């Protein structure tokens, strides 16, 4: 077998016809600037071809379900294995997907609870046992010899009704007596039962005496009673109060509730057999949220303090205004009073109605026929009930979307957010229900499995299941995810977390001879846990697999067996193999930027002095969201603050859920529901908050950097102002590819046409009318400085900056894109082709190009994702520019180069999950380095 993957003439995206040999069965790291072509080589060439060849070996029928990769643009490749890609984009958005289901641990848990679980009554909590006829007889024969018994069939247990048919059937079957509500009756007499009361009826099947030769008779009687009562038998010991109840089913003798036989599907929230019927197994329900109806209680109703579809206006001429006036009159409050000063009874009535009590409504209308006024009486249903009713009745998507703005996800009241029906939640293993184990952090779940006490019989049944569960939990712990719970929704995980979960799942699969391609697995991981991740990667390699990791993290690069540095720069200036070999080879290479940072020739300096917080601070008091332990935190204004801590310590809960959502709600008038906290102060000096994350700048291929930054509007105005356009009567709309007029109608302005290929991937070909140029011929005839609109959109930012050098407005926006290191992207490049890091930098550039108010709070969540050390250097300059203008920058980050340039650090921890959520340290980086309790400080000390 080849010991190398040999590639010749790779030309995907910006790759410049490169030839390279990569060793197999090794840990290979590909590095280089953002946009240099690493992903083009790793994913679009090696993975695409490995996957395509594997899929091509399957039947045509199977291929149509798998979705085939396009053949990459290259001359030759050999030495490939079947390829598995673990990137960051494919984390599930399905609300049914959890950490437990993704890793398959939950499937083994379902099997465990079905095989060795102990059922309890969902109503009274009493343990339920199932017994066979033989077990019942054995128990009865243990009674002292000579004991007199009555064998009864409990046909009715605490049910309302006259039960005439039950008694008639028993009489017809030859039974003579029955015990009704504890008293004996002859079935020959007429028994009158009150149909409104609950009754219990036991038919007397036989009277027996316990002795060895009576076994046959007792067995027959027990079988008969069981048949009559659907598996239940009562043995009444004559002359004493003792009564034995037996069940052949899982049924509670006291409550009469029976549960079906335990099966794995009973514990699945994705099947009707196990899912909570109220929330269909989602654990959450969308309900009207009063906090979103009254987002700011400092305002009065007259000032528009109520923000709900159909209820915003307090004007007398509107229906809502009529109701408000009537409510104010009846409950004695003023519509100009701030809502927080209204009596609680009044607020309650506004939200939940008058409970059938009529209100006196006055109307005063005027139209062409004249004016008319009067009054009438009508109860008020309340805003919450009104929105709920309209939401379920309306057919209008617009109306539903409007009402949804007042709704939030609330844990289901029936199952308490645990997704399962009550019968499944009443089964325990080791005293815990399946939902309780799913809610444990991985570390605690390992302890629980280790400490399980089982009977010898249960141990034999559960041995293999427990081994699988423990092994998979161990893999999650090894990739630094021991703070996650198995019930955590997959859609709430960060890119790095979901990637490491899939990595743990792959190790669990124990495949050999596979080519794994990973995209920055260290994202979101604290330096403390990096060693665990590297050990996991080496473990995969040692099993006999080849690993190609696209990575910027210094520890990972240094741990690699072989490094491929792509560059030297980004975009059109990249796409070459700058250097390949060991760490020493890379460090010795003059052309390699990576080598220069690794060797220390280039580095990000520690700032000579740090900004002082002179504008006050934002203070959050009593933060309790997720695992935050009722903490008080201050964010100084006008400086750069880094929020650090190990994975799962509560950084996102504090910054994204509380700080961002609260300020967005109060300053940006956003309809967001912040996380739990007591109070927030210090917002007077802020005008808005902006979250610059790595989500795409647009969801469709039609959106691009030019449309996002506003450049496209300026360019279209420029073309519309040319003499040629004015003669033809073209306005700016003519130069848009999104609307009729100037666009090519054959491809609707896409530039491409899709051709459906059955059994093969769909083929996109350039439109044969416009040749992929998106516009019709007349529009393309209009030129500015010799270029038409298509040619301008096809320019890189760098080229456009020179082209528009004498237009200050355009030049300013282009320069900010250059400043953030995006000179290589094209103005019209589809936003779907941009990486997360590139999308974030387009957003940063857009913010930089706006006039700064000096009172904005910027939130950046791990902005160094996908960035090379040189890109991080550039990012730091941008962050400094934002802060130097007086703005406040709050960054969640693990990258030490960014942490060391911060003016203020808030370190959360000390651990993740339950053991996190407290403030370990707050102060300058220098002070943090001296804090022994801070993991971040320990790593920071080496850099300062």
Task: Describe each PLM feature range.
Residues 1-944:
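Conserved phosphate-binding elements of NTP-dependent enzyme cores
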